[in-house]
Amino acid sequence: MLASRIGEIRTITLEDGSRVTLDTNSVVEVRFDGERRLVQLERGRARFEVAHDARRPFVVAAGPGEVVAHGTVFDVDLRRSGILVVLLQGSVEVRRPAAGGKSAASTMLRPGQQLAISAGSAAAPVAIRAPETRWPSGMLSFEDAPLVDVLASANRYSRTQIVIRDPAVGERRFTGTFKADEPVQLAEMIGPMFGLRIEHDQNDNLILAAGK
């Protein structure tokens, strides 16, 4: 079992030379044998830089699907709703179980595409947004994203949480780049952008409230 702590981004080289970069608070289990290289993503997000081995496919299992690769670079993000696969280099096959005992459905991705799947369904592949691939550097970038989604991502990196009490404020759009593990700096960036004041609760979380 390989894991990263809250706020930690950790890179591990596997026995076959492949590299796995774990995002904050992520867990994988690695099981290699003579026929395949299996990695189970139990929690969080990981980037896989796969060493080529024609005899043993590299398989990442997560949630409702699995990703099969030979020599490539891709991200897998395990979410409550399912998984998101982002392909940076090479090619991968994304498989998901089919109902009624049918053969598993599969989709091939090309570099620059991503695919979201949930139990029994999948969206069509779409182009990735370059900022979404920067997380291994410790920076998070967003383009025209709902503020509530930005904070949900940022809050994974720190025990200090940033909270918005007004749902309407959470739907406002954010574009910017920030260091993932510095919540105070992020709150100080967002506050003036949206006319919000920063308060602290008893747990030292940061509350963004409507300004007076």
What are these regions, as identified by a protein language model?
Residues L14, D33, A98, S118, ...:
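Acidic surface patches and DE-rich sequence motifs
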Residues M1-D77, S81-L84, S141:
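Juxtamembrane extracytoplasmic segments of single-/few-pass membrane proteins
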Residues S4-I9, H52-R56, L87-Q89, R110-P111, ...:
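A short, compositionally biased
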Residues V59-A62, V67-V68, D75-R156:
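Short, polar/charged, low-complexity connector loops/linkers at domain or secondary-structure junctions
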Residues S121-K212:
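N-terminal export/assembly leaders
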Residues N25, Q114, R159:
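ATP/adenylate-binding site constellation spanning eukaryotic-like Ser/Thr protein kinases
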